[in-house]
């Protein structure tokens, strides 16, 4: 029953920056730069619904579908800076089956902030974006935290708009050379955006396995994932493993169009994993998920994926990534800690 709106976004940026300090040492390394960035957002007035006979306009009485999103054009001049004090620990069997990877121990902070210098009539703001990474542990146990926040302080309404928050807390425990346990908690939120957008359980990165067709969505989302993985030594040329997992999630309506406060939803399942050749970082995975608590439209799901999770700590959910201001380069203050 949800509706869709036409959204057009354009962005541009130009910046310069330089590094402070020597990254080959264990001391603090910094970054400082400036950025000219701009964005244009336009949302269509009509809300439509996809039906078997084509697109159908939603009725005017549907206030959620008729919510107004004024067009916005803004150019900002910002300063970007950050620092990191990090050393790397080489571990094996965390995000890959047996391959080695570097885990960052320490702290990293990046900040970008600046006012609008040209904007749609009557609009003026100060844009702020920040990112924090922290890691601690050794080859047997490791914990990582990443938080990324952005928003615009509207100078006329004295409020915040375009708020986007993404965060992930992970814990790894290597019980033996063949046994690894992982726990991941992901919290995401969007509020007062300049265009309609919802968070849901359907997102491949940020959603719940077994809940691809529930249709529930909102402005805030919490996901807890627990996995218990065992290596199976069946072939010297490749690595194989089996894992049991459970996903638990909840949605809050927030101010998202058609947003709802969901029940606590959960699924359990079995994963078959492989890497080729033996010691390879690329992971081939089949997830078999069965919903146990939640929406009636949830159902058994088979999911295939191929990825290399050793290269970056977190691949941000797609629905959160597209909510972010397009003119903020992802590499500003966001040095990959792995």
Q: Where in the sequence are the language-model features?
A:
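Gram-negative and organellar
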Residues: 1-76, 82-87, 91-106, 120-121, ...
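C-terminal transmembrane beta-barrel domains of outer membrane proteins
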Residues: 108-338
């Amino acid at each position: 029953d949800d509706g869709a709106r036409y959204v057009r976004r354009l962005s541009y940026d130009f910046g310069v920056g330089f590094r402070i300090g020597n990254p080959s040492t264990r001391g603090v390394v910094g970054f400082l730069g400036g950025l000219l960035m701009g964005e244009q957002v336009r949302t269509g007035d009509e809300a439509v619904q996809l039906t078997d006979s084509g697109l159908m306009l939603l009725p005017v009485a549907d206030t959620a579908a008729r919510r107004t999103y004024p067009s916005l054009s803004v150019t900002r001049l910002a300063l970007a800076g950050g620092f990191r004090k990090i050393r790397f620990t080489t571990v094996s069997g965390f995000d890959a089956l047996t391959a080695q990877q570097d885990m960052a121990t320490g702290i990293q902070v990046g900040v970008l902030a600046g006012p609008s210098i040209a904007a749609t009539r009557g609009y003026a703001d100060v844009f702020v974006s920040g990112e924090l990474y922290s890691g601690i542990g050794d080859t047997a146990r490791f914990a990582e935290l990443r938080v990324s926040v952005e928003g615009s302080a509207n100078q006329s309404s004295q409020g915040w708009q375009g708020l986007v928050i993404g965060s992930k807390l992970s814990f790894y425990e290597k019980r033996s050379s063949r046994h690894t346990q992982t726990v991941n908690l992901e919290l995401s939120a969007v509020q007062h955006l300049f265009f309609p957008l919802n968070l849901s359980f359907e997102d491949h990165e940020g959603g719940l396995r077994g809940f691809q067709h529930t249709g529930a969505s909102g402005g805030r989302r919490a996901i807890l994932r627990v996995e218990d993985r065992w290596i199976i030594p069946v072939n010297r040329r490749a690595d194989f493993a089996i894992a049991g997992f459970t996903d638990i999630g909840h949605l809050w309506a927030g101010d998202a169009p058609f947003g709802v406060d969901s029940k606590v939803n959960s699924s359990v399942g079995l994963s078959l994993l492989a890497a080729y050749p033996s010691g390879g970082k690329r992971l081939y995975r089949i997830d078999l998920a069965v919903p146990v608590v939640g929406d009636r439209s949830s159902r058994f799901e088979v999911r295939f994926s191929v990825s290399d999770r050793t290269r970056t700590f977190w691949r941000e959910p797609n629905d959160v990534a597209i909510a972010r201001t397009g003119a903020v380069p992802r590499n500003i203050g966001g040095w990959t800690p792995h």
